[in-house]
Amino acid sequence: MRGISLWSALAILTSAGGCANVERSRDLSNPNVPPAVTATQVCSNCHGVDGNSVSPNFPRLAGQNPGYLATQLENFRSNQRSDPPGFEYMWGISHHLSDDQIKGLAEYFAKQVPQVNAPVDARLMAAGKAIFENGVSDKEVAPCMACHGPQAQGIASFPRLAGQHQDYLVKQLHVFQETEGRPGTPMKQITHLLTAQEMEAVAGYLQAFPSAQ
């Protein structure tokens, strides 16, 4: 996969659920292509032109911390992040990116405006809010906001979670819990303490941010 051509990588992407066809006239190996053009003609295929993806199979990138995005792209490029979407889609794409291109793409998506989502089930929202703000004390699980910020906006190397797809968040929590696909994170220990119901609740609450307030 690491040596996959741009066209092959994009062919894989266009066959995946939730991806729409885009113009494929740019070569990722060309460092002179502006980040906005790469985002529009390549990344938008799954993540949306403005980073607000439609399909929960692909994360929303709008408003994400640029440092976090850059780190994830670097991890894809070096194959350190090996969860299934990583090696199926992002390894081939990120292999073509230079450091400057990664920085430019991260800054582009960080400047996009995240969509606001409607709240989910009221009981789920209440349970998710409790975990986000207070943690799960009897399991010694810290509040999510301790690392991700009181508005789930992300802090430093910790990602923005506000407005992210519920299904995507749940899948990532299971990746942390069940695999070694995302090493070097405190989330692995935390997710081992959470039930499936607790994961669903906090992910549903985060998807509705900031309308949950």
Describe the function of each predicted region.
Residues M1-P31, E74, A208-Q213:
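N-terminal export/targeting leaders of redox proteins
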Residues C43-V49, L105, V141-Q151, V202:
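The canonical Cys-X-X-Cys-His
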Residues V54-R60, F76-V120, I155-R160, T179-F209:
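Axial heme c-ligation environment in periplasmic c-type cytochrome domains
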Residues V33-S44, A62, A70-T71, E133-M145, ...:
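Sequence context surrounding c-type heme c attachment/ligation sites in exported
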Residues C19-T40, N52-N57, K111-S137, S211-Q213:
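Electrostatic cytochrome c docking/interface patches
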